[in-house]
Amino acid sequence: MIKINDFNTQHISCEYADSVIKMERHFKMGNRYLSYILNERNFRDDIMLCPPSKLIKVIESFNLRFPDIDYDAEDWRYFRNYMIRQYERVRKGILHLVLNSLNLSVCPYCNRQYIFGTDNNRKVGAQFDHFYSKSKYPYLALSFYNLIPCCPTCNKAKGEECIEINPYIEGFENNGKLMVDSPLNCILRNADWEVKFKADDRCKTNIQAFALDELYKKHKDYAHEIVLKSVAYQKGYYNDLKISFRNIGITDETIER
């Protein structure tokens, strides 16, 4: 899993929020949940542009304001369905432009499938996952940093499942690495080797949600090629060191020690 480059996300997110506000000037009122996010909160700044690390605070504030939500009640179902409909309108009219602006070519969840935007509104080679489910947290349905551009495979795999790592904040970095469990067997093309993740608990949540272990096991040919190149590079680097140190009087025996 990779981090989404944030060099211009602030500009893009503001542009996105302003566009949505223009489209949705006439949000319907008369619902207590809508009244809360539109009147008691600054919908644009507090919710739509809420930084990814603070989305959980929005959830906590909402739960504090409405501690006893009846999820089967008519007012909640109206609010949920209304916010999801607004998202669907935005997705069709604006989000392909956001995707293009992010300059993101590969799915951040799996770092495997290519995604792309188009210059028209008919086709977008990515889907948008709600990091926090739009069904459970409809007030975040339009939050920019809750919308994760991803490939259809990852979007379907995750569904409404909660995961630990938001790619707007971080990727796996050094906490989730792909490893070859037996480099020697890999080099010799013996059957007994696998590509596996060495990961902490937070990364494991994402790995399980997107079945990344199974996905990367299918790429043993690529892993074999990478291991061979790594060995070749190290051998070439070692030979270069020997030549360089010989010139200053250091013997091969000393280098090998």
Where are these regions (language model features)?
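C-terminal, charged low-complexity interaction regions
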Residues: 2-33, 196-257
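Short, exposed beta-strand "edge-strand" segments with a Pro/Gly-rich flavor and a Y/T-containing core
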Residues: 43-50, 141, 146-150, 159, ...
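Short, intrinsically disordered, charge-biased short linear motifs at domain edges
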Residues: 91-98, 135-141
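Short cysteine-rich loop/turn motifs with clustered Cys
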Residues: 96-125, 151-153
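Histidine-centered nuclease catalytic patch
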Residues: 114-146, 160-166, 170-176
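Domain-level detector of nuclease and nuclease-like folds
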Residues: 157-217
